[in-house]
UniProtKB/Swiss-Prot annotation:
Task performed by this protein: Monoterpene synthase producing mainly (+)-alpha-terpineol (44%) and (-)-limonene (33.6%) and lower amounts of (E)-geraniol (5.9%), linalool (5.0%), myrcene (3.4%), (-)-alpha-pinene (3.3%), (+)-sabinene (3.0%) and alpha-terpinolene (1.6%).
Family of this protein: Belongs to the terpene synthase family. Tpsb subfamily.
Keyword Metal-binding on entry: yes
Chain residues that bind (2E)-geranyl diphosphate: 286, 323, 327, 466, 469
Catalytically driven reaction(s): (2E)-geranyl diphosphate + H2O = (R)-alpha-terpineol + diphosphate
Domain of life of the source: Eukaryota
CDD domains, sorted: Terpene_cyclase_plant_C1
Residues at which Mg(2+) 1 binds: 323, 327
Organism field: Santalum album (White sandalwood)
Source organism phylogeny: Eukaryota, Viridiplantae, Streptophyta, Embryophyta, Tracheophyta
Protein name, entry field: (+)-alpha-terpineol synthase
């Protein structure tokens, strides 16, 4: 069966387990006076996706045993004696292959040992070593000051001219510069210097492998990349290297396929849930289950976080529909009623809404309450008040944007972003993920409420998600008649051209990343994995909106990656 079809499958729809009776309204299905969304139907065949739950890629037992054996070999490799730069390069390869989560403690132990080593002769005056050391240490929570790059400057304070010929060093410097904080001017200089020189030489690099790495990095730096997506690309790339370690490559392929088989089962179960709700038949809203699962894998791909992915995908799929109701389909009166019901977390008054909108609302309630029940059963914590609060806050932000649209009000960029960093909806997913993963002794009503208050880490995550979304979707959304986005707000406020406005928003993206980077080192009540969730949702947005709206419209780049990450296992050699 093909993974794609021209329209969603006409599978049997089972009755949704609603908590209220929806009274039909006169003219409830009328499209009169409603704006057209112009959304294309999902290109994914839901019958095929459901089949993944039972006929997913079964990893053979011999491959599971082989993976365990190779894992021990790689662990010994990490702990083995080698030159410091070689150790850093091994760790870099492991991370890019998507294997960091398998060797978290070993990697941190080796990096901390290199950090404590008082000898600096191996990295000082070596651009590649200095930059790679800086990036890997910061990525793994060990602070290194930007001053380590001072030795690479000449007497005039500029980077030494001979460094322009060191392509590998420039690439490492480029990647390191994206971990900078606000006020770290030296790293800003490093970013400009490395970007300029890499662009100058990218077409004339003699090594094909290095040339591909440079072009890949210039398209998207590692720090902005989703680990699971990057791993799928890098496994193929690593196989082409002259000095490839066969056992490391084999383990990376096996582990990728093992995790993929788990993801396939999860996706199949989610597709069944989606079809059973009946929401896949609503044509006036986006049908985005597959995109949301890809996003869930960007947020957290590790096998042990299946419940986090499940809740995040369900909520995100409903969020897209609720967003469309507020942005395009619902009348202002209907949106007021919808918001009031969610704010009270009480379905009284739902009979005042059209059936289609009521279906979305009831599925939202049922899903949130089920997640809350699972939390109470599994963790002994009542999370429903916090999930309900996140939904209520989100709907109020949506309503504000709808009122702006209906009144013709044009917000300033600052006003728009203050509302938009919450209306982008990731606070809801992050609150739920926090409730699911926080250490139980630290999980309290107050700590959960703090996440809902949008503290700095969550704020930067929301801001970046909003900015990426606007860069990718604003043109299509304005054509549909949606609320003005950040680009249009800036144009209206300053008189700038669209091109200039886009450059300004891109500048805000770079600055917001600096704020996020600093948050990763500041004292907060949060720990892993929650900190990583915040950063990784942004990386998912970067992927979907890098070349346009790859979320609402299944573009070739999102479709191809979805197939390679979720559907097709990596081929193994016959002897494997």
């Amino acid at each position: 069966m093909d993974a794609f079809a021209t329209s969603p499958t006409s599978a049997l729809i089972k009755a949704v387990n609603c908590i209220a009776h929806v009274t039909p309204m006169a003219g409830e299905d009328s499209s009169e006076n409603r704006r057209a969304s112009n959304y294309k139907p999902s290109t994914w065949d839901y019958e095929f996706l459901q089949s993944l739950a039972t006929s997913h890629n079964t990893v053979q037992e011999k491959h599971m045993k082989m993976a365990e054996k190779l894992k021990e070999e790689v662990k010994s490799m990490i702990k083995g004696q080698m030159e410091p730069v070689a150790k850093l390069e091994l760790i870099n390869i492991l991370q890019r292959l998507g294997l960091k989560y398998r060797f978290e403690s070993e990697i941190k132990e080796e990096l901390f040992s290199l950090y404590k080593d008082g000898t600096d002769a191996w990295w000082v005056d070596n651009l590649h070593a200095t930059a790679l050391r800086f990036r890997l240490l910061r990525e793994n929570g060990i602070f290194v000051p930007q001053d380590v790059f001072e030795t690479l400057k000449d007497k005039s304070g500029k980077f030494k001219s001979q460094l322009c010929k060191d392509v590998r060093g420039l690439l490492s410097l480029y990647e390191a510069s994206y971990l900078g904080w606000e006020g770290e001017d030296l790293l800003d200089e490093a970013k400009k210097f490395s970007t300029t020189n890499l662009n100058n030489v990218k077409e004339s690099i003699s090594s094909n492998t290095l040339g591909r790495l440079v072009k890949h990095a210039l398209n998207l730096p590692l720090h902005w990349s989703a680990a699971r997506y990057e791993a799928r690309w890098f496994i193929d790339e690593y196989e082409k290297e002259e000095n490839v370690n066969p056992n490391l490559l084999k383990y990376a392929k096996l582990d990728f396929n093992i995790v993929q088989s788990i993801h396939q089962q999860e996706l199949g179960n989610l597709a069944r849930w989606w079809v059973e709700t009946g929401l896949d038949k609503l044509s006036f809203v986006r049908n985005t289950l597959m995109q949301n699962f890809m996003w869930g894998c960007a947020m957290v791909f590790e096998p042990q976080y299946g419940k986090v992915r499940d809740a995040a995908v369900k909520q995100a799929s409903l969020i897209a529909m609720v967003d469309d109701v507020y942005d395009v389909y619902g009348s202002l009166e209907e949106l007021e009623i919808f918001t009031d019901i969610v704010d009270r977390w009480d379905i009284t008054g739902i009979d005042k809404l059209p059936r289609n909108i009521s279906m979305i609302l009831l599925t939202m309630f049922n899903t949130a309450n089920q997640i809350g029940y699972d939390l109470l059963r599994d963790r002994g914590f009542n999370g429903i008040p916090h999930i309900a609060q996140a939904w209520a806050t989100l709907c109020k932000k949506y309503l504000k944007e709808a009122k702006w649209y209906h009144s013709g009000y044009k917000p300033t960029l600052e006003e728009y972003l203050e509302n938009g960093l919450v209306s982008i909806s990731f606070v809801l997913s992050l609150v739920t993920a926090y409730l699911q993963t926080e250490i139980l002794e630290n999980l309290t009503y107050e700590s959960a409420a703090y996440v809902n208050s949008v503290p700095p880490l969550v704020r930067y995550s929301g801001l970046l998600n909003r900015l990426y979304n606007d860069l990718g979707t604003s043109s299509a959304e304005i054509a549909r008649g949606d609320t003005l986005k950040s680009i249009q707000c800036y144009m209206t406020q300053t008189g700038a051209t669209e091109e200039a406005a886009r450059e300004h928003i891109k500048g805000l993206v770079h600055e917001a990343w600096k704020g996020m980077n600093k948050c990763l080192f500041e004292q907060t009540p949060f720990a892993e994995p929650f900190v990583g969730f915040n950063v990784n949702t942004v990386r998912g947005s970067q992927f979907f909106y890098q070349h346009g709206d790859g979320y609402a419209v299944t573009e070739s780049w999102t479709k191809d990656l979805s197939l390679s990450v979720l559907i097709h296992p990596i081929p193994l050699n016959e002897e494997d």
